[in-house]
């Protein structure tokens, strides 16, 4: 007799974490339903594909979903998003779920085929408006949308590299970048000033801890 696979995290733990996340960022019921579908699919795929660090699964909603969802409040009028290195879908799929009711669209860029397949399935299951591009970020800028409101990335590359990827796609006065960073943000900012002129704005993550969001709206390469 074949036994059902044991859940990666208990239902009660995940429900408690979800409640904590939605207390931080209240959302409409329709968006909650889309995120529920996405989270359920991620748990299924996580058993065979490493989409997020296993140690973070009990905090899936606070550590990943809410951390991603807070970007919407920083760019409430943004409709055209591009997410570098989407991986397990944070923040790309979460943003796409949020865009479903406002006519927005998210382009998700991922270089690993298995993860790109998951992202496509996640968008389908959640009913979220997005396109997945299987590509390496640095070599395929011409394949990405050119009219963008916001460019995002989370746990992908050092800040100075992310700015290098984003710079050709940013329209002054129109496009902003929101990069999620951790405790080393100050060191990354210092390193980035060696290569770029920019005036970053820092936002502390609503999820607490040592997370930061680096907001950038104008960059210029140093010569």
Curated annotation (Swiss-Prot):
Q: What is its EC number?
A: 2.1.1.170
* GO MF, one example: rRNA (guanine-N7-)-methyltransferase activity
**Predominant localisation class:** cytoplasm
- Indicate the enzyme's highest-level EC class: transferase
Q: Name one Pfam family in it.
A: GidB
One GO cellular-component annotation of the UniProt record comes to: cytosol
Q: What subcellular locations does the record give? A: Cytoplasm
User: Cross-referenced InterPro entries, in alphabetical order?
Assistant: rRNA_ssu_MeTfrase_G, SAM-dependent_MTases_sf
Question: Keyword set for this entry?
Answer: Cytoplasm, Methyltransferase, rRNA processing, S-adenosyl-L-methionine, Transferase
The answer to keyword Methyltransferase applying to this record is: yes
Q: Which reaction does it catalyse?
A: guanosine(527) in 16S rRNA + S-adenosyl-L-methionine = N(7)-methylguanosine(527) in 16S rRNA + S-adenosyl-L-homocysteine
Q: What Gene3D superfamilies does the record tag this protein with?
A: Vaccinia Virus protein VP39
Q: Where do the annotations place S-adenosyl-L-methionine binding?
A: 85, 90, 154
Q: What does this protein do?
A: Specifically methylates the N7 position of guanine in position 527 of 16S rRNA.
Q: Which PANTHER family match?
A: S-ADENOSYL-L-METHIONINE-DEPENDENT METHYLTRANSFERASES SUPERFAMILY PROTEIN (PTHR31760:SF0)
**Family matches, as HAMAP family:** 16SrRNA_methyltr_G
Q: Which family does it belong to?
A: Belongs to the methyltransferase superfamily. RNA methyltransferase RsmG family.
This protein is called what? Ribosomal RNA small subunit methyltransferase G
Query: Which gene is annotated as encoding this protein in its UniProt record?
Result: rsmG
């Amino acid at each position: 007799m074949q036994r059902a696979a044991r859940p990666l995290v208990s239902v009660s733990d995940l429900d408690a974490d979800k409640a904590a996340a939605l207390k931080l960022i209240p959302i409409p019921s329709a968006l909650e339903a889309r995120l529920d579908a996405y989270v359920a699919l991620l748990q299924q795929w996580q058993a065979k594909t490493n989409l997020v660090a296993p140690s973070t699964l009990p905090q899936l909603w606070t550590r990943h979903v809410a951390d991603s969802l807070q970007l919407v409040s920083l760019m409430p009028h943004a409709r055209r998003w591009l997410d570098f290195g989407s991986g397990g879908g944070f923040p790309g799929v979460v943003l796409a779920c949020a865009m479903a009711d406002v006519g927005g669209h998210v382009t998700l860029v991922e270089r690993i085929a298995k993860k790109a397949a998951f992202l496509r399935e996640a968008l389908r299951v959640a009913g979220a408006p997005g396109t997945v591009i299987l590509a390496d970020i640095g070599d395929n800028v011409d394949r990405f949308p050119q009219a963008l409101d916001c460019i995002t990335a989370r746990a992908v590359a050092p800040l100075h590299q992310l700015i290098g990827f984003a710079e050709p796609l940013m329209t002054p006065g129109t496009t902003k970048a929101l990069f999620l960073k951790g405790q080393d943000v100050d060191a990354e900012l210092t390193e980035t000033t060696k290569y770029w002129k920019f005036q970053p704005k820092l936002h502390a993550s609503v999820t607490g801890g040592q997370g930061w969001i680096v907001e950038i709206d104008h960059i210029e390469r140093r010569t």
